[in-house]
Design a protein with these regions (language model features):
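N-terminal secretory signal peptides that target proteins for export/translocation
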Residues: 1-23
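Sec-dependent N-terminal signal peptides
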Residues: 25-36
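C-terminal motif of bacterial Sec signal peptides marking the signal peptidase cleavage site
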Residues: 41-42
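Boundary/entry segment of secreted carbohydrate-active catalytic domains
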Residues: 51-109, 150-151
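Acidic/aromatic/glycine-rich contiguous surface patches that form carbohydrate-binding/processing clefts
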Residues: 350-382
Length: 382
């Protein structure tokens, strides 16, 4: 008996009770029936449960420098004397820019770029995509927009790339479906185990086939020479993908010694190797917009008690307080901060070097992190 049948019977009984109430017992039964009818009416009118949608969450990426995202761009008051970057704009066949989700307000639609890569969707714990950024959050750019796909774990990369675990093909299906509103897919898998290089190539081959007419761009780590058993064999990847973006940055990083994010000499060697492996029409050289800082001495650490006791002695700490019996103290030290960054001048000098070497396409990581003057010195070939 379904919900509707039960309600009809209860309504009939309650109607009879109302028309011929005899004593308190019948009145009580009538009242109970009426209450049941009301409750069941509400329950039966509840619509079917909608399909569950993964809530939008922020995903930290190792590829992205940590930064606080301001609410909107502001006019800059430069802190140091400026050097003009060039007399005439540099022209490239294509200029790609990456945009992180959450930086939409920083999207400069008037900037001279030919396509945008929207960062991004990530593989979750069980081998499926966590979420996909919505293209409709972007304005109508009248330019191609790529979806960026990442996998931020070496062990997870192994499980989704090695076909024996049966996760690769379902993931490819998800990626193809996620790319439907976009013009192409940008694969940024930076944590591939050494033994999975062959599996990565197979993954790209199957993915490219399933994408059909959609473009496939693959990000690869910077190299200055061929490495044995490299998981990013430039030449082989270029035979599969429509283009390769060489991430020529992070020469120095947060845990290394201070230095350039991408020095000119290092970038020159990276480009020389890339040009020897990848056809010019498929090669994209990536440039950084961001900078990094380093602080010396590095004081965030764990201590053994004897070492900590020596530190307190050296810094003349004699006052130690307790909170719930646990000792703590504070002291001041002088720190030295080193900052290496890029402005319009350094970015354009690096871009000019690439152009002089025969590079026809460049990409920037990422919009919203740049010196805004940089756009005055770039243009896309008509």
């Amino acid at each position: 008996m379904n919900c509707s049948n039960i309600m009809n019977l209860l309504k009939e009984y309650s109607a009879c009770g109302i028309s011929g109430i005899r004593g308190k017992k019948n009145a009580l039964l009538c009242l109970i029936c009426c209450m049941i009818v009301i409750v069941m009416t509400a329950c039966c009118s509840v619509p079917a449960e909608k399909e569950y949608v993964v809530p939008e969450i922020s995903i930290d990426s190792a590829a992205a420098p940590q930064a606080v995202v301001p609410e909107s761009p502001q006019q800059l008051m430069y802190a140091y004397e400026r050097t003009p970057a060039a007399e005439e704009p540099l022209t490239f066949k294509e200029i790609y820019v990456y945009l992180m989700e959450g930086y939409e307000k920083w999207l400069n639609v008037d900037a001279p770029f030919s396509s945008l890569a929207y960062f991004g969707t990530e593989v979750g714990t069980y081998g499926s995509l966590l979420r996909v950024p919505v293209r409709k959050k972007l304005p109508d750019l009248q330019r191609p927009v790529y979806l960026v796909a990442t996998c931020q774990s070496m062990s997870l990369s192994h499980f989704v790339l090695d076909p024996q675990f049966k996760l690769r093909d379902p993931l490819i299906q998800e990626l193809v479906a996620a790319t439907e509103p976009y013009d192409g897919l940008d694969v940024d898998y930076e944590y591939i185990p050494g033994k999975d290089g062959r599996h990565f190539l197979e993954f790209l081959t199957h993915l490219k086939k399933k994408l059909g007419n959609k473009k496939l761009r693959v990000c690869v780590k910077a190299r200055v020479r061929e490495l044995q058993n490299d998981v990013y064999p430039y030449k082989k990847i270029s035979e599969i993908a429509d283009s390769i973006m060489v991430m020529a940055y992070d020469e120095h990083w947060s845990t290394s010694a201070p230095g350039e994010v991408a020095s000119m000499d290092w970038c020159r060697r990276v480009a020389e190797y890339a040009l020897s492996q990848v056809p010019a029409e498929k090669l994209v050289m990536g440039l950084p917009f961001y900078g990094r800082s380093w602080v010396e001495p590095k004081l965030n650490r764990a201590y053994r008690f004897p070492v900590l006791n020596d530190v307190l002695t050296e810094n003349n700490v004699v006052k130690v307080e307790r909170r719930d019996g646990v000792p703590w103290c504070e002291y001041d030290v002088t720190a030295h901060v080193s900052v290496w960054f890029d402005d319009a001048y350094s970015v354009i000098q690096r871009a000019r070097m690439y152009k002089d070497m025969g590079v026809q396409r460049i990409a920037f990581w990422s919009m919203g992190q740049e010196d805004p003057e940089v756009w005055n010195y770039l243009q896309v070939e008509d």
